[in-house]
């Protein structure tokens, strides 16, 4: 069962989308995130605040990646001045893309 982590982050400087995309690429390359996660999305809330949604393959994968994630979060806080405002997480019980695949495989009507 997929596991979802949703967080909000505050930056000292206005968000620079290109810089953040470069940082995300660095995280992917450094920590081999594909081993544990399905998707990570960062989105802008306001000029200084962004949200993140991370979808892990399972709760076990979330816990396996947790130490690496802590290292990158510490770096983000110390070097990029990005601090965690709040976080929520839990198992996903309904995922639209999974339902579409399941219905297609079963030849069920889509409406």
Regions found by a protein language model. Name each.
Residues 1-50, 57-71, 83-111:
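Short S/T/G/P-rich N-terminal loop/turn motif that feeds into the first structured element of a domain
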Residues 77-82:
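Conserved short loop/helix modules at catalytic or binding sites
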């Amino acid at each position: 069962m997929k596991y979802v982590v949703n967080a909000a982050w505050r930056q000292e400087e206005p968000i620079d989308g290109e810089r953040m995309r470069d940082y995300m690429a660095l995280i992917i390359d450094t920590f081999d995130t594909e081993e544990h996660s399905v998707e990570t999305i960062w989105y802008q809330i306001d000029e200084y605040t962004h949200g993140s949604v991370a979808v892990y393959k399972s709760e076990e994968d979330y816990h396996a990646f947790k130490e690496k994630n802590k290292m990158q979060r510490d770096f983000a806080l110390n070097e990029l001045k990005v601090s965690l405002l709040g976080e929520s997480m839990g198992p996903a019980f309904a995922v639209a893309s999974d339902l579409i695949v399941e219905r297609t495989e079963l030849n069920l009507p889509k409406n």
